[in-house]
Amino acid sequence: MAAGVTPSGTSNWQLRDSERIIRGNEGLLGRKHHLVAITRLRNEALILPDTLDYLGDHVDAIVAYDDASTDDSVDILRKHPKVALIVANQAWEKNVAARKLAEGRHRGLLLEMARAELPHDWMFCFDPDERVTGDLRGFVAGLSADACDAVRVRLFDAYITPDDCEPYRPDRALLDFRRYYGPEQRDILMLWRNRPEIGFAEGHGRTPGGMERVRTDLYCQHYGKSLSVDHWEETCDYYIRHFPFETYGRKWSERKCQAIHTLSDFMRPLYEWGDTLFANAVKI
């Protein structure tokens, strides 16, 4: 697959001159799989080894988009046995509008590549700082043919607290890393069947279109706010600089220097992971 052309069997998304395909474990290509995963990332070397090992227990193959990382993310991806293909971008777009459009384009490109090179029954779309709890592979295998087209997963943010503020280290698992979580529940579409009518169009972010029957199940821990105090500040700066101010920049400006929490960002009590958290969940 050369830059500037679509992978065979696809039609919507083209590689740009700044993007190149890196083949990982070629033994995964051209084989039928039950569950394949796609992800997009930038500078995730700190958590990426654990992310790939965690995903490797659940999925058959991974396709990744690296958005011009300046750390070792690409090398980590290339060496992992479950990573089949990588799109490595060399030119990161700083423009606010371009960043928003890139979310759907990158995932659309990955989805089409997976369909062309990794025939599969189900797709799992994840971010590196997310950990779905429970038996993901077993859950998908247990879905009957007429159960649903897609699955939304209940996601909760983990928080740094006064008695749990040590930074994440790469020698430990990210799953259950933090003790406390906010009750705000976001239902994120992460799983869908490999059907041609399901796909990404221009303007889509994380969620593709074309699903008719969607159920909500499973739970997910999100660590985007809780890896470390330094990472929190970097996250604030990223949203302030590269996303629309009214919808993202304003609230993240107000969160600067507020990494350690006693309440959630929405001023609600924090809970340990488990039934009490779920019973107090507030959909947002």
Predicted regions and their residues:
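Catalytic-site signature of metal-activated, phosphate-bearing donor transferases
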Residues: 2-29, 100-108, 133-284
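Phosphate- and divalent-cation-binding pockets in alpha/beta enzyme and binding domains
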Residues: 47, 72, 76
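Short beta-strand/loop segment that forms part of the nucleotide-sugar
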Residues: 60-71
